[in-house]
């Protein structure tokens, strides 16, 4: 049986670890509420700018590369959204697995893949495997700031507009080797979508070129151009300035919206994954302390029994010695 002193030392160590995991669980729980609120607050803007882009795309004759399908894409960029910190279960591994699946799919289509990584864990993961990273950003996974996404957006749009035949200058805030990196014809993003406290699903999404879905309105006999709903108006719209100018200026904003929304989802998912992992770790620590305490009690009882046996044996020996005298 294990030494009683060693058991007590292990119990003390596990209890110390339990305090850390419990604190991490409480911190993650508080962050989830804030992250969920930010995700919900971003939805109205995302919904409205999507409707505006679709309306402009239907009214515009602009042949912009950001909304035009490439004829022969040769290189695709993947933005991998990971975390800056660990202790979040399989959160990062699920992202890396989805990235590997997307990468294989793109390579099977004959496209060269370049990686852009957001989060220290992703940078460490790919550096350890000697994977080339074209650019990285760190320090913003838990609390993304919209202004910080602008450098990321500008770099990705610049690389996309340059195309696979060109190069793009590295903008401020991007960690990259050299002052220029190759351009690309597509931009994909892999991040974790928040569904609930217990469900976070890695998702692969094409960011550029933008897919615009314009739904044709069906008119029925006797209906007019104004919907019964107050927020759905189907009348013709005059744009000021013209639709082409508006669309060209709104497309970068739309990309920013897509990136920031994904980062908010990822932040909420990271906190939820960390809370789940830390809750499980705390429960395991409690169970381990209980088992170690039981073993320690058994060891203590065995020690006491042995001491009593030795005392009784010693007393008997003294008694026998006295009788012989």
UniProtKB/Swiss-Prot annotation:
InterPro entries, alphabetized: ATP_synth_F1_ATPase_gsu, ATP_synth_F1_gsu, ATP_synth_F1_gsu_CS
Output the Pfam families linked to this UniProt entry.
ATP-synt (PF00231)
What GO terms in the biological process aspect are recorded for it?
Answer: proton motive force-driven plasma membrane ATP synthesis
Cite the Gene3D superfamilies for this sequence: 3.40.1380.10, ATP synthase, gamma subunit, helix hairpin domain
What cellular component GO annotations does this protein have? plasma membrane; proton-transporting ATP synthase complex
Membrane topology per the entry is: Peripheral membrane protein
Provide the GO MF annotations for this entry.
ATP binding; proton-transporting ATP synthase activity, rotational mechanism
Alphabetized UniProt keyword annotations: ATP synthesis, Cell membrane, CF(1), Hydrogen ion transport, Ion transport, Membrane, Transport
Q: What is the top-level taxon of the source organism?
A: Bacteria
Which PROSITE patterns does this one have?
ATPASE_GAMMA
**Among its keywords, does the record have Iron-sulfur?**
no
What SUPFAM superfamilies does the database record attribute to this sequence? ATP synthase (F1-ATPase), gamma subunit
Which cellular compartments is it found in? Cell membrane
Concerning its family, UniProt says: Belongs to the ATPase gamma chain family.
- State the protein's purpose: Produces ATP from ADP in the presence of a proton gradient across the membrane. The gamma chain is believed to be important in regulating ATPase activity and the flow of protons through the CF(0) complex.
Give the quaternary structure.
F-type ATPases have 2 components, CF(1) - the catalytic core - and CF(0) - the membrane proton channel. CF(1) has five subunits: alpha(3), beta(3), gamma(1), delta(1), epsilon(1). CF(0) has three main subunits: a, b and c.
Protein's recorded name? ATP synthase gamma chain
